[in-house]
Amino acid sequence: MKNQLKVLRAMRNWSQAELGEQLDVSRQAVNAIETGKYDPSLPLAFKISRLFGQPIEEIFDDGFDGGQNAKG
């Protein structure tokens, strides 16, 4: 899943390890989420949202546009 996690982390000058500590996950988990190899659980997504003070949908892009771009 595409996301803004790397950008948000960089804006705070946090390493992946530092963000992992804030979220109680490993540096490897942060890397996997940032690169889209792993989708966070809903509780983790909420934790990320609270940490950065942004709605989940502004951090994560699930690729669903609600039919906005449907051809018909």
Question: Model segments located where?
Answer:
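Short basic helix-loop element that most often maps to the first helix and adjoining turn
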Residues: N3-Q22
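Short, charged recognition helix plus adjacent turn
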Residues: R50, F60-G72
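Key DNA-contact positions within bacterial/archaeal DNA-binding proteins
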Residues: A17, Q28, E57
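DNA major-groove recognition helix of helix-turn-helix/homeodomain DNA-binding modules
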Residues: P43-E58
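Short, basic-rich loop-to-helix N-cap that marks the start of a DNA-contacting helix
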Residues: K37-K47, D65
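Recognition helix of helix-turn-helix/homeodomain-like DNA-binding domains
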Residues: V25-Y38
